[in-house]
Amino acid sequence: QHWSHGWLPG
């Protein structure tokens, strides 16, 4: 998956 939460590069 690909999102912007802070801990995942998105």
From Swiss-Prot:
GO molecular function ontology, one term from the record: hormone activity
Classification via InterPro entries: GnRH
Main location: secreted
Gene Ontology cellular component terms for the protein in this record: extracellular region
Pyrrolidone carboxylic acid PTM positions: 1
Source taxon at top rank: Eukaryota
Signal sequence annotation: none
Keyword Secreted among UniProt keywords: yes
Protein role: Stimulates the secretion of gonadotropins.
Family statement: Belongs to the GnRH family.
Annotated protein name in UniProt: Gonadoliberin
